[in-house]
């Protein structure tokens, strides 16, 4: 109804307003939202959210972790869900960033959560990029 549509609109406006240029990085010519910027969206808005791990595959022998999670966001009577999958393997680590099972799993889970946030708030992210970073 109209009240729900107004709530969605106001939430998106607030999300755009919490972002800044430092929340993005240009990778191969494309602006990508950083993890901290995406987490700001979740923590700065008047919404409730639940992050649940649905599947976890870890191969200790080859150093591979795959996480599938579901992000549920609630605002008023509106509830939205998005899946996110994150993968990390041992070959991504080096002398600077040491390989541990914790680091590998944490990186895979962060990637899964990031993808779910991008799915739910993609229009906000795209709007910010087009209006604030488009010519940079």
Where are these regions (language model features)?
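Polyanion-binding surfaces on beta-sheet-dominated domains and ring/shell assemblies
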Residues: 1-136
């Amino acid at each position: 109804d109209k009240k729900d549509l107004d709530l969605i609109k106001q939430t998106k406006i607030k999300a755009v307003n919490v972002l800044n240029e430092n929340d993005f990085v240009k990778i191969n010519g494309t602006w990508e939202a950083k993890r901290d910027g995406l987490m700001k969206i979740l923590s700065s808005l008047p919404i409730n959210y639940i992050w649940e791990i649905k599947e976890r595959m870890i191969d200790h022998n080859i150093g591979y972790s795959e996480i599938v999670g579901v992000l549920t966001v609630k605002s008023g009577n509106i509830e939205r869900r998005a899946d996110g999958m994150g993968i990390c393997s041992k070959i991504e680590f080096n002398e600077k960033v040491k390989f541990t099972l914790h680091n590998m799993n944490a990186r895979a889970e962060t990637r899964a959560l990031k993808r779910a946030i991008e799915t739910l708030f993609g229009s906000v992210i795209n709007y910010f990029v087009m209006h604030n970073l488009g010519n940079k």
